[in-house]
Amino acid sequence: MKAKDIRALTTDQMLEKEKQYKEELFNLRFQQATGQLENTARLRQVRKNIARIKTILSEKELSKN
């Protein structure tokens, strides 16, 4: 997900997306531990998406003040 797409979301939608990505990350880590993960690059993508969402949320929070 690109930062441009994330910025278009509302705060509630961003928090929901973050929750979804965290769940996906948990499942991917579990698959990796059991040797079932085929697309290891997905781990990195999900981590970076979570970081993007957190960054934009903190930017919005700072701009309010």
From Swiss-Prot:
> SUPFAM superfamilies under this entry?
Ribosomal protein L29 (L29p)
What GO cellular component is one of the record's annotations?
cytosolic large ribosomal subunit
Q: To which species is this protein native? A: Lactobacillus johnsonii (strain CNCM I-12250 / La1 / NCC 533)
- Record's protein name: Large ribosomal subunit protein uL29
Per the record, a Pfam family?
Ribosomal_L29
Which molecular-function annotations from GO does this UniProt entry contain?
structural constituent of ribosome
Keywords for the protein's UniProt record, in alphabetical order = Ribonucleoprotein, Ribosomal protein
Q: Which NCBIfam families match?
A: L29
Question: Where does the secretion signal sit in this chain?
Answer: none
Matching entries from InterPro entries are given as:
Ribosomal_protein_uL29 (IPR050063), Ribosomal_uL29 (IPR001854), Ribosomal_uL29_CS (IPR018254), Ribosomal_uL29_sf (IPR036049)
Q: Which family does it belong to?
A: Belongs to the universal ribosomal protein uL29 family.
Q: Which CDD domains does its entry note? A: Ribosomal_L29_HIP (cd00427)
Domain of life of the organism in this record?
Bacteria
